[in-house]
């Protein structure tokens, strides 16, 4: 089935790159703020992930990538986007604005059949690849791919809980800057700290990522919460999860469980490394979460801290496509 992308920002553009790399068919892009000519430029040149390796051009009022024609719309309101004109049925809602079932459902007016919100949602069912995809059913029309941080945390929490039982835990994500932040101090009425210069500061921030794990792994509901520090790096973030466990274990036991999961049921979603890595080593890594065996610590047999990396842009965008593929498989069955 054909895919449409609403919002051609960091995630929208990388979802298109991800789609092209695995043969998923994107037929339309909507963005009211980006003219076609500028779309070509923005898609081709990326300061973080490099110049796009294929061919990008505009032709007959369309965006053409590697010979594939993508229809471009510039509508402000989702209900005005004529998705059916381009044959787009599965929509990636990556504006960051229409994150509830009601708001995202506006896409159906233009002929869309399903919507994946590329952000957490207050009411849409949330999915994390490798964790709860089996809960998806045909009758769901608007779903959420959760957040990049939830996608990093959930696989790690799943492995810990299934093997050693999480009693309770606190998460900190040391998170790269995103587009909502300011280059220098500026107005940010809802989040005063968030309005401070992104390149000059370590900025404490809130995140719903840990609580959201309770939505995708119901047994952990109410057992995890967390916060974030925004730091002056352009991409790649890291989750630090401190947990009290119900079963006694050694840190080596935890490493073994993570390694086994990364090579088995969670392959492609959870990675494992014993190397002396730093954040930039993960730019362009398409896994959701890469467990850092050397960085974790243990205080007692039931009290540990685990560390896991993620490319918050690229890995997450790959998951959006993975979720779409799963939905299409279930929907066509």
Swiss-Prot record:
<dbReference type="GO" id="GO:0006006">
    <property type="term" value="P:glucose metabolic process"/>
</dbReference>
<dbReference type="InterPro" id="IPR020830">
    <property type="entry name" value="GlycerAld_3-P_DH_AS"/>
</dbReference>
<dbReference type="Pfam" id="PF00044">
    <property type="entry name" value="Gp_dh_N"/>
</dbReference>
<feature type="binding site">
    <location>
        <position position="178"/>
    </location>
    <ligand>
        <name>D-glyceraldehyde 3-phosphate</name>
    </ligand>
</feature>
<comment type="pathway">
    <text>Carbohydrate degradation; glycolysis; pyruvate from D-glyceraldehyde 3-phosphate: step 1/5.</text>
</comment>
<dbReference type="GO" id="GO:0050661">
    <property type="term" value="F:NADP binding"/>
</dbReference>
<feature type="active site" description="Nucleophile">
    <location>
        <position position="148"/>
    </location>
</feature>
<comment type="similarity">
    <text>Belongs to the glyceraldehyde-3-phosphate dehydrogenase family.</text>
</comment>
<keyword id="KW-0963">Cytoplasm</keyword>
<keyword id="KW-0324">Glycolysis</keyword>
<keyword id="KW-0520">NAD</keyword>
<dbReference type="InterPro" id="IPR020828">
    <property type="entry name" value="GlycerAld_3-P_DH_NAD(P)-bd"/>
</dbReference>
<dbReference type="InterPro" id="IPR020829">
    <property type="entry name" value="GlycerAld_3-P_DH_cat"/>
</dbReference>
<dbReference type="Pfam" id="PF02800">
    <property type="entry name" value="Gp_dh_C"/>
</dbReference>
<dbReference type="InterPro" id="IPR036291">
    <property type="entry name" value="NAD(P)-bd_dom_sf"/>
</dbReference>
<dbReference type="InterPro" id="IPR020831">
    <property type="entry name" value="GlycerAld/Erythrose_P_DH"/>
</dbReference>
<feature type="binding site">
    <location>
        <begin position="207"/>
        <end position="208"/>
    </location>
    <ligand>
        <name>D-glyceraldehyde 3-phosphate</name>
    </ligand>
</feature>
<keyword id="KW-0007">Acetylation</keyword>
<feature type="binding site">
    <location>
        <position position="312"/>
    </location>
    <ligand>
        <name>NAD(+)</name>
    </ligand>
</feature>
<keyword id="KW-0560">Oxidoreductase</keyword>
<dbReference type="GO" id="GO:0006096">
    <property type="term" value="P:glycolytic process"/>
</dbReference>
<feature type="site" description="Activates thiol group during catalysis">
    <location>
        <position position="175"/>
    </location>
</feature>
<dbReference type="InterPro" id="IPR006424">
    <property type="entry name" value="Glyceraldehyde-3-P_DH_1"/>
</dbReference>
<feature type="binding site">
    <location>
        <begin position="10"/>
        <end position="11"/>
    </location>
    <ligand>
        <name>NAD(+)</name>
    </ligand>
</feature>
<feature type="modified residue" description="N-acetylserine">
    <location>
        <position position="1"/>
    </location>
</feature>
<dbReference type="GO" id="GO:0005829">
    <property type="term" value="C:cytosol"/>
</dbReference>
<dbReference type="GO" id="GO:0051287">
    <property type="term" value="F:NAD binding"/>
</dbReference>
<comment type="subunit">
    <text>Homotetramer.</text>
</comment>
<feature type="binding site">
    <location>
        <position position="230"/>
    </location>
    <ligand>
        <name>D-glyceraldehyde 3-phosphate</name>
    </ligand>
</feature>
<feature type="binding site">
    <location>
        <position position="118"/>
    </location>
    <ligand>
        <name>NAD(+)</name>
    </ligand>
</feature>
<dbReference type="GO" id="GO:0004365">
    <property type="term" value="F:glyceraldehyde-3-phosphate dehydrogenase (NAD+) (phosphorylating) activity"/>
</dbReference>
<feature type="binding site">
    <location>
        <position position="31"/>
    </location>
    <ligand>
        <name>NAD(+)</name>
    </ligand>
</feature>
<protein>
    <recommendedName>
        <fullName>Glyceraldehyde-3-phosphate dehydrogenase</fullName>
        <ecNumber>1.2.1.12</ecNumber>
    </recommendedName>
</protein>
<feature type="binding site">
    <location>
        <begin position="147"/>
        <end position="149"/>
    </location>
    <ligand>
        <name>D-glyceraldehyde 3-phosphate</name>
    </ligand>
</feature>
